[in-house]
């Protein structure tokens, strides 16, 4: 299974995350695919996701944080499932010496995402 973090907006209007895995159930129809690279040590302040999307990290290690202080570390090979398209959003910072190379795969908001949360 592929490690994944799902970012979503809770009923309180703030972003939260759940750790889990991406499953291989079925194909999903994507709206767009975008490749992007950001220089080492970069950061991006508070923002919601522009659309529901997978963000597949190819290189770089990042610290993500929600407005309420929840944090997780995204590593190469991990998938961020960004669903916090409204509310307080999240921020990130590159914490290693590598550029963040990634692939964005955008979906419709009503697309069922193949995600299984870790057992608590």
Where are these regions (language model features)?
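A short hydrophobic beta-strand segment most commonly corresponding to one strand
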Residues: 81-85, 95-112
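Short, conserved beta-strand element in jelly-roll/cupin
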Residues: 47-64, 106
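Short acidic, Pro/Gly- and aromatic-enriched capping/linker segments at domain boundaries
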Residues: 1-8
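Short acidic-glycine-tyrosine-enriched beta hairpin
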Residues: 22-24, 67-86
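Conserved short histidine dyad/triad with adjacent acidic residue
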Residues: 9, 22, 31-49, 83-87, ...
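Short beta-strand His + acidic residue motifs that chelate non-heme Fe in jelly-roll/DSBH
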Residues: 44-46, 64-65, 82, 88-96
């Amino acid at each position: 299974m592929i490690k994944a973090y799902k970012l979503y907006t809770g009923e309180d209007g703030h972003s939260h995350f759940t750790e889990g895995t991406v499953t291989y159930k079925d194909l999903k129809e994507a709206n767009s695919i975008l490749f992007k690279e950001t220089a080492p040590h970069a950061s991006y302040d508070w923002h919601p996701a522009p659309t529901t999307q997978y963000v597949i990290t190819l290189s770089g290690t990042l610290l993500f944080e929600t407005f309420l202080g929840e944090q997780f570390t995204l590593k190469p090979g991990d998938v961020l499932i960004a669903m916090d398209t409204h509310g307080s959003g999240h921020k990130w910072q590159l914490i290693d010496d590598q550029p963040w190379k990634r692939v964005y795969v955008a979906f419709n908001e009503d697309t069922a995402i193949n995600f299984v949360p870790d057992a608590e």
